[in-house]
A protein has these predicted regions:
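Aromatic/pi-system hotspot detector in well-structured domains
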Residues: 59, 105, 149, 210-211
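Short C-terminal boundary/hinge segments that cap the last helix of small helical domains
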Residues: 25, 161-162
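Short, hydrophobic secondary-structure boundary micro-motifs
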Residues: 61, 83, 162-165, 194-197
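Extended hydrophobic secondary-structure segments that form protein cores and membrane-embedded regions
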Residues: 88-92, 206-211
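Alpha-helical substrate-binding/gating segment
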Residues: 134, 149-161, 173-210
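N-terminal Rossmann-like NAD(P)+-binding domain of SDR-like oxidoreductases, especially those catalyzing
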Residues: 1-142, 177-183, 187
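Heptad-repeat alpha-helical coiled-coil signaling segments
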Residues: 169-171
Length: 211
């Protein structure tokens, strides 16, 4: 599915694809030097709380080192009179709120008690980007996205939709197209402080029924 989508995008003249690893600093630096981006949107990461329990090294490499490399590239975009990065937009996660039971979440809530490595690293990303913003005047916008849903890939392939925890968990789900629209709007300018959820958690099986 990803390869098919990539083939569709190749028809656009302004589209470029570079296959690489976020944790490879040389690759990130070369991309910034070649394309000189004014707006950077970082959605690249190893996602998921469960997988971080059994594969912690993957999260440290992709989500911690990879994000650091992005920040450093933004910082050095100012070097030698080059056009600097004007705005960094990146995805965080609602998991940074830990076991907070108050809904809806607020940007004023404390987020210093993560309950997973994934959440801890995402919070680390937020703190690090804040420091870089203050030190190097890099405008940064964090998107504390809620759980995405969009089952079309599995439906097209005739696969079973997997529901964890017997469908008993509840979460604020966000449709993937709404996430895309939100990212595009944020790219145009930093918004007011707001979370991407409505405070109406529902079990995943209710979302599946919509399909």
């Amino acid at each position: 599915m990803k390869e098919a989508r990539l083939n569709e995008l190749k028809q656009f003249e302004n589209f470029s694809f570079v296959k690489g690893n976020l944790a490879d600093k040389a690759v990130i630096e070369s991309i910034f030097e070649q394309y000189k981006p004014e707006i950077v949107v970082n959605l690249g990461a190893q996602a998921g709380v469960r997988y971080s329990i059994t594969n912690p090294a993957t999260y440290v490499e992709a989500n911690l080192i990879g994000f650091y490399n992005i920040l450093e590239a933004c910082r050095h975009s100012y070097d030698e009179g080059r056009t600097p990065v004007e705005h960094l937009v990146y995805a965080s996660s609602s998991s940074v709120y830990g076991s907070n039971k108050k809904v809806p979440y607020s940007t004023d809530d404390k987020v210093d008690n993560p309950v997973s490595l994934y959440a801890a690293i995402k919070k680390s990303n937020e703190l690090t980007s804040h420091a870089y913003s203050k030190l190097y005047n890099i405008l940064s916008t964090v998107l504390p996205d809620m759980a995405y849903f969009g089952f079309m890939n599995k439906l097209v392939r005739g696969e079973t939709i997997q529901i964890f925890n017997y469908g008993n968990c509840k979460c604020d789900f966000t449709y993937v197209d709404d996430i895309v629209e939100g990212v595009v709007r944020v790219m145009q300018g930093a918004p007011e402080r707001k979370n991407g959820e409505d405070g109406l958690p529902v079990p995943p099986c209710e979302i599946v029924k919509c399909y």
